Amino acid sequence: MPGIKVREGDAFDEAYRRFKKQTDRNLVVTECRARRFFESKTEKHKKQKISAKKKILKRLYMLRRYESRL
């Protein structure tokens, strides 16, 4: 769980910015959104398949783009 120590003389904005960075790095907000509603195993599996397909297509696109430069 993210937490910061506010140093003496620190402005609120600086401390808040550091806290936001930590929460973003630890994926707290995204995990919270994902757990907000129940997701069955089939839905999770579908999402994983879709993301895997997107990754493959992205790699193919980058590979073809790289090959066209040669």
UniProtKB/Swiss-Prot annotation:
PROSITE patterns: RIBOSOMAL_S21
InterPro entries in the record: Ribosomal_bS21, Ribosomal_bS21_CS, Ribosomal_bS21_sf
GO cellular component: ribonucleoprotein complex; ribosome
Entry superkingdom: Bacteria
One Gene Ontology biological process: translation
GO molecular function, one term: structural constituent of ribosome
Family matches, as Pfam families: Ribosomal_S21
Keywords from the named record: Ribonucleoprotein, Ribosomal protein
Family: Belongs to the bacterial ribosomal protein bS21 family.
Name of the protein in its database record: Small ribosomal subunit protein bS21
Organism in which the protein naturally occurs: Helicobacter acinonychis (strain Sheeba)
Name of the gene encoding the protein in the UniProt record: rpsU
